[in-house]
Amino acid sequence: MERYQDKVVLITGAGDVAEAAAKRLLCEGAKVAFSDFSQEALDAAISGLKAEGWDGERLMGIKCDVRKYEECEAAANAVLARWGQIDTLVATAGIIRHCPIDEMTEAQWQDVVDINLTGVFHAVKSVVPSMKERKYGHIVVISSI
């Protein structure tokens, strides 16, 4: 039996790191929900996994901007409505601005902070109540620079 058999994992982001995590979790038997502000990224991640043979019933995509707590809460609630639990949060959503620091605007910097830091806070805050209620849950935060 796989370690994540019938476990539900919510992954923030739908890029390469999120997809790699999803593949590993799917191999272990998990159901995986991606949340991302880009519908195109969600569609690409899910269609790519389906094309590789993964069961679409074990996949879910939710449009969600992690900068907004209400959207993270709605994403968590959508997962709970479909599968009844969230066992693990894997926070991978993040952005980088490719420009010299002395050319970066305050707005660009704030966007990085809002997604890479505040977004993690929002995602964690949105799943903790259901994890506390079940007295079970794992939170993994992945970042890179």
Each predicted region: which residue ranges?
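Conserved glycine-rich Rossmann-like NAD(P)H-binding loop of the short-chain dehydrogenase/reductase
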Residues: 30-44
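Substrate-binding pocket helix/loop in short-chain dehydrogenase/reductase
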Residues: 100-101, 108-110
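Residue(s) in the substrate-gating loop at a strand-loop-helix junction
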Residues: 144
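The beta1-alpha1 cofactor-binding region of Rossmann-like NAD(H)/NADP(H)-dependent oxidoreductases
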Residues: 39-40, 63-74, 106
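Conserved NAD(P)H cofactor-binding loop of Rossmann-fold oxidoreductase domains
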Residues: 92-97
